[in-house]
Amino acid sequence: METIRPEELADLQLKRLKWTLRQAQEVGLYQKKFKEAGISPDDIRTLDDVEKLPFTYKKELQAGYPFGLFAVPLKEIIRIHTTSGTTGKPTVVGYTRQDLENWSELIARNMTMIGLGEDDI
């Protein structure tokens, strides 16, 4: 990944962004926000189009407490992380098995990138 050509990286980023936006459309909050903004994932044709996307605010995330912002059925969530931050009102993030596998791979790649190996941990 670290040696990918810039054009290939941009294509990959756009593909993954569109996938993420399609997933987000499964969440009522984002259905509403996309509709109000008059935008859909298909309207994102370049990375610069990210400027068309509406902002999400922490109060909106907190309003979804506890499970209102999951884009997958609750039975697919295998780990939950909550934080209260400074407001005392929780924000909840749910992770699927695939999310955790992706996270593990990302961390391993980052460790390799900075020169760490199996014997260093």
Q: What annotation goes with each model-predicted range?
A:
Residues 1-82, 88-105, 109-118:
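Nucleotide 5′-phosphate-binding alpha/beta core
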Residues 121:
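Active-site-proximal cofactor/substrate-binding loop regions of enzyme domains
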